[in-house]
Amino acid sequence: MATLHNGVLMPMVGFGCAGYVRKPALLDALSVGYRLFDTAQAHEWYLEEEVGDAIAEGHVNRSELFLTSKLHPRDLGATRTLEAFPDSLRRLRTTYLDAFLLHYPRCFGTLCAKEPEGDWRAAWGALETLYARGEVRAIGVSNFGPAELQQLLDVAKVKPHLVQSWMDPLHAERPLRALCARHGVQFQAYSTPGLPRQDSSQPFSA
């Protein structure tokens, strides 16, 4: 277990739910002992409902699980973040989350039909509100670079508990990991074996 700076315990290894992971695979993950499940609101890559269905059938107490979800970048902004959060609770069939992260610091590509209501700074304030209410046990960010994380650390009332980033043998993320270590923020890596695609420029991709 990793201990976040607020004392919350988080499993060291989790089951990533990107790529439209379905209930049978999730039930298998539960049966072999996975207890951390990482999902997100972005239906472009994730299906929170499948996670919720698996948990409902998995015969594991909610208190034994660590559920992480992430805000869709189209909902950046104070009001929209607070409005979007309950959707994750409903889809995951839970009354609280163990961690809720900003998925990206901004919208990009085709993710957003229009500009979000606000920016990541306003959205972070909303996460701090959710944390103060006890609706989430830890808050953090995903896909923030060192400069953006430093900006967050400079303005946050609640220091992020968790920073999630892609890391594999070709992307060690040393500056970001060092920044997290200096501030007592837990670094969490995803896609550590490599991204799930064949790419001659990425020899470690799986």
Give names to the regions the model predicted:
Residues G19-L30, G77-L92, G145-Q151, H171-A172:
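Short, acidic/polar
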Residues M10-V21, K70-T79, G109-G118:
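Active-site mouth loops of central-metabolism enzymes
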Residues R22, Y104-A206:
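Beta/alpha (TIM)-barrel catalytic core signal, keyed to glycine-rich beta->alpha loops juxtaposed to Asp/Glu
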Residues M1-L65, L82, A126, P193-R197:
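N-terminal binding-site loop/beta-alpha segment at the start of enzyme catalytic domains
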Residues F15, F37, V51, L67, ...:
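Conserved, mostly hydrophobic/aromatic
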Residues S63-D75, A99-P105, Q164-M167:
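A short, structured active-site edge motif that brings together acidic residues
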Residues T81-L102, T129-R133, D154:
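CE4/NodB-like, metal-dependent polysaccharide N-deacetylase domain
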Residues M12, N61-L65, T95-A99, R137-A138, ...:
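Short acidic capping loops at alpha-helix termini that bridge into adjacent secondary structure
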